[in-house]
Design a protein with these regions (language model features):
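Core domains of carbohydrate- and sulfate-ester-processing enzymes
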Residues: 48-64, 132, 198-211
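Surface-exposed recognition segments
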Residues: 10-18, 117, 141-143, 164-268
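Glycine/small-residue-rich pyrophosphate-binding loop that anchors the diphosphate of NDP-sugar donors
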Residues: 16, 28, 77, 146, ...
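Active-site microenvironments of metalloenzymes and redox enzymes
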Residues: 3-10, 21-124, 169-173, 177, ...
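Chymotrypsin/trypsin-fold serine protease catalytic domain
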Residues: 118-144
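Signature tryptophan residues that serve as conserved aromatic anchors
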Residues: 92, 109, 135, 155, ...
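Active-site rim elements
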Residues: 74-77, 147-148, 152, 228-234
Length: 268
């Protein structure tokens, strides 16, 4: 993962490129949609009150339209998402299905995006065919679009580039590639910002959509609080953020799963 020194648009935090080993996992073919997230939002078997330990709460309704009129039902991606909101959706899925889902690590995301390639984009080193695969600045009309309308990568994953940027599990670290971990690398967050997103979004230029590009989360993404007290669920000023989920092939123990969600959610 990472980019070579000669890659056009390369930034200093993308290398040196290195080989990693990942445990097997499945990844969602598309970004989680508004309809899918709305099922969580409307699930009345869970409360919107302050949770007890280990409990599930539903998102509190924002006071503004976080889609900015770009679209909701019918396959549009869930947007304006915080990492907390994305992980609570994963926790809800686990409680509903007994299957453990989570966000991908930065390494898992990039590996899946590349789909076996070492080029700047999953299809080539240049941007000639980018519009066939991605919604971005040149073709999006400055809005996100329904998922899976563009071509997938070689592994059948849609919208890995553009549309909405996607959360990973990692704390952003400029020196990520100098870390020694080569097996299942993960930088566990210790602060809310910056954390790492990948993929670029509908308003980005082509260089931001490269497989190796890294995005730092920013507290300015929630300057206008959609809730009082400060929302953990939404990023009111970042309609370009969504997520997709993964499922490890080897299911962790219930104790490990509970520890995972507690570590990420309790002090967010």
């Amino acid at each position: 993962m990472g980019s070579g020194t000669g890659e056009k648009g390369r930034k200093g935090d993308e290398g040196p490129a290195k080989e990693i080993t990942l445990s097997p996992y499945w990844m969602g073919a598309s970004e989680v949609t508004y309809d899918e997230y709305d099922a969580f939002f409307k699930d009345e078997s869970f409360t919107r009150n302050q949770p007890a330990p280990d409990a599930i709460t539903r998102p509190s309704p924002p006071y503004i339209d976080l889609t900015l009129g770009m679209g909701k039902q019918g396959g549009f991606p869930a947007n304006s998402m915080s990492q907390y909101g994305a992980l609570m959706y994963c926790k809800w899925l686990y409680k509903k299905t007994g299957i453990f889902y989570r966000l991908p690590t930065e390494a898992e995301w990039e590996y899946a995006c590349r789909a076996g390639t070492k080029t700047a984009y999953p299809f080539a080193n240049d941007t000639t065919g980018l519009s066939k695969y991605a919604w971005y600045k040149n073709n999006s009309e400055n809005k996100y679009h329904k998922t899976a309308l563009k071509l997938p990568n070689a592994w059948g994953l849609y919208d890995m580039l553009g549309n909405v940027a996607e959360w990973t599990m990692d704390q952003y670290d400029e020196s990520y590639f100098s870390k020694p971990e080569a097996k299942d690398p993960l930088i566990i967050p210790t602060t809310r910002h910056p954390r790492t997103l990948k993929g670029g979004n509908y308003s980005d230029d082509a260089t931001a959509l490269r497989s190796a590009n890294r995005i730092k989360s920013n507290p300015d993404w929630n300057r206008r609080d959609p809730q009082i007290p400060r929302s953990r669920w939404w990023n009111a000023d970042a309609p370009f953020i969504g997520f997709r989920i993964v499922r490890p092939v080897k299911k962790p123990s219930e104790e490990e799963i509970n520890h995972f969600f507690s570590a990420y959610l309790d002090n967010y």
